[in-house]
Amino acid sequence: MRRKHALKLSANDIERKKIFFQFALMLMAAFIGGLCFVAALDTSISHDVRGKIISSFSGISLRDFDLMQFVRSIITACLPYFVSVLIIFVFSFSYVSYVVSDILLALNSFFTGVLVALVALCLTPAYFLSAAIFIVCTVTSLLVLMYFAYTCALLSLGIRLRVSNGRMIFSGKKLLYATLKTIATLGTFIILTFIRSIALLI
């Protein structure tokens, strides 16, 4: 009996490692794809985009600062992460959790790679600090999304194991834990996006 239980634990550990490796591989591949996409852009397009990004990093005076516009920009920047987190959370109670998480990670990683590559074009001495903070916060947000997707995938794995053992699909404690983790993840995105937006004002 103990040996059977040990084998089951070992199989679960292997499954967890496979999930993490799968998500990490998808994230890196899509991120590199975004970098390569920018590298393949026409030079004139890159130049135009570079000009717009540099103007964004030029900073604004406090006299021209609009608080409501600043808040709206944070909400707009957080929106893709919010939508991704909520979709991953909902589908974590289904059997297609891995597929949905893979797709969303790939999309977010690709666009993050594009954004980082475009901002990296502006890493001149004048805007180095702002651009560096922006890139660090953006990449950190992507890693937070991956970690959240990983924890939701483990929740989905636990549900499948419970169903296979003829037990209740999920307990109220598990649901509360998943909900609190979702709220904490959304809060983390708001903080990172706020810091990223402040970098544009430096």
What are these regions, as identified by a protein language model?
Residues 4-20, 63-64, 166-173:
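Cytosolic juxtamembrane amphipathic/interface segments immediately preceding
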Residues 89-113, 164-180:
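Cytoplasmic juxtamembrane regions at transmembrane-helix boundaries
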